[in-house]
């Protein structure tokens, strides 16, 4: 490491102010911070010093996604190899086949499942990262500021929220929209009012709905095959619930399968166990707000319970209880990773409770009442992002009025 440190120290003058490569300093800076902690020192007389800086915070969040990421790759392989064996077609039908064939299509081998999932997920993640970091570098050079480590988190969250069969050009287009439109045009990290990863996914959801939703996109190789065996469905539990309610859910899936993650879905959203590990890490390090998490759970519980009480003979989603809402769709993934994003969420303590409740209520309303969107977590969080400044303003004004009233007494 001393050799690398000396190498960076020798090269730094060329990239610093007045150097021959001054305008490319953001590129140098991102590689330096990749290997070493920032060497910047506080220069202003008024400051707050904390061991948990932005770089370390983003690294922790990135590492917290690993349980969901690795289980997601396993689940892609598990679901897909089972399907390919069912139709007796040991070939995905596209370029992935040449890589998958290194270990083979035997569905009962653990390494085959992990490898199959990696063959589909890693190209999506790599595309997302490379395209996104290119935009970050471009804007950093134009604005002459350092590259923030927040993109490492945005890229992995975007990739984990995508189906495994997503075309790579769409992954590139989605992260481009999320970074450029969702963040950079507002000034970059810390100034965006929408979650960049969700903004990119929402763009794909409305621009290319057949590739981001439906029954075929959740299992790799399914879209390449012309034959679907009788009685087989790639539908997610949420899609089944929207069509046939709790009876359909329990007929095709057990609650524990949904909790463990042995179901079709986006790469990182299926396993509540893996997501819970991440939640514990983020809460223990105080990166995520427990107020937002509890508020979201409370809003979901109350709203779904009210719909259960009201009931409906025509809409089966009315009767789906809260414990099913928790384990199907992207509720848990959005709750832990997306809703707690500090920049686009509420900043006051009371505001975080309200913000979380708004998400919990809205996601159930979209799932139950709106037949066009069986999955509501993405739209619920983006809607709450828009309300976050208003919520914080109301909380601050309420505190001012309360203090004025006490002062006048």
Model-found features: residue ranges?
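Long hydrophobic alpha-helical segments that form multi-pass transmembrane helix bundles
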Residues: 190-276
